Amino acid sequence: VTVSVTSRWIDIPADGGSFQGYLALPKTGSGPAVIILQEIFGVNSHIRSVADQYAADGYVALAPDVFWRTQPRVELGYEGADRQKAMELLQKTDANTAVADVGAAAKALRALPEVTGKVAAIGYCFGGRLAYLAAAQGSVDLAVAYYGGGIQNSLDQADQVKVPMQFHYGELDAHIPAEAVDAVRQKFAGRQDSALHVYPAADHGFNCGDRASYNAKASALAHGRTLTFLGEHL
């Protein structure tokens, strides 16, 4: 997507030090904010393009470097040795610490003059779980989780989620079985400010144009639903 956005890497204070995040600004220069939470492949060109897309949509978008404690600014592809490396980085990453870092990113965004209004988190894969956990911790005003693996194992925190929450799942996702999706659906059933969508014929990673599992139709539909959700609640 060729869009008119300006971007830069910024420092995010955390634990007495700092880590970096990729910041993309809308053409207007300001707006509400979205934290774009990476998959296990780092803040790679795809995640930066997602941030650029949301900036083009009118949001201040920040993609924090979630793996900074293990390997700062790592960028990986989706196959072979890169995939193996990504799995190793995931195993070395403590989810609670990563969620605290998401909170630090939210705090940094709220301090930026460009940010007017609320801060949402939109996460993909591992980042989807982090978006959910950040919502449970109250560090963001809204969360969207794309194929967030492991959310079904943290449903004891669902009652702590006091903000609007949207879930996107691919019907063919072998990483997240239908029972897991059902468990999340049941836990959030009856909440006016939450929604769960399952995409037929879509697999894990369906939003990523650089992956074999990319599904353009599901990706466009989910993006539209996410924008509508942001528009309603941010």
PLM regions: where:
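N-terminal cap/leader regions of alpha/beta-hydrolase-fold enzymes
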Residues: V1-L234
